[in-house]
């Protein structure tokens, strides 16, 4: 009886559709961002546009001898805590360290500077909690429940899909696609939350410090829906030309990205295919720079 039940459970586990957003996978994913014991020579930092938009696998496939990690967090900003995490994972014994910073207008606001998501993950996932996630929760992915509403969503062609990768990337898709949904959200966000000189100065100081450690720092503005980009430029106080100039004067390098080559599902975040395309473009631009040094 037990064997029959076990076999049936395994069959259901293998044959059933995967959850749209596995809670067990998500728990391990975020814990691994702050409690990974490995070192890397390629770090990607930013907010949700970055952790959904840049795949370390594509980077590693193009730039030889690279071990990459995406350290993006929801609504992530650039404070000392974020850079402490970057420095924690960098392999400073390696002379080929690279940091890619994915900028968004929101990432340089006071709200993003607080980095509430990063801080909450670090505060929560310590000691036994971290051990439990790594050793128990991860094993429960196989048994993640599928709720009835997800079955209906798949049938009618809607839903928000997340695929978590141990390297820090989340491949995301959302149906139906609605790029205009971000316009109202960011109009509200920037009503009382503008570009922060303090946050930008911390970013510049850390770019300068990293370059003095022989780390190459590349920055880019993450691509978005053209109407959202125009809205952000008009409301946020983010001046791309000034930001680019100051980053370069502090030792950083700027990657120009053509927004129209990439598509979003909600105006703000790249779909999986576009995230891979962007990652390949970033890797090729960086590789070209390294070869021409």
Task: Give short role names for the model-derived ranges.
Residues 204-218, 246-253:
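A structural motif corresponding to the C-terminal end of an alpha-helix
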Residues 15-38:
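Alpha-helical transmembrane signal-anchor/signal-peptide segments
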Residues 103, 112-213:
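Secreted/periplasmic serine-hydrolase-like ester/acetyl group-modifying domain
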Residues 45, 49-134:
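Membrane-embedded segments
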Residues 234-293:
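Long, positively charged, glycine-interspersed low-complexity recognition regions
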Residues 1-16:
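Hydrophobic membrane-insertion alpha-helices, especially the h-region
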Residues 41-42, 98, 218:
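Structural motif
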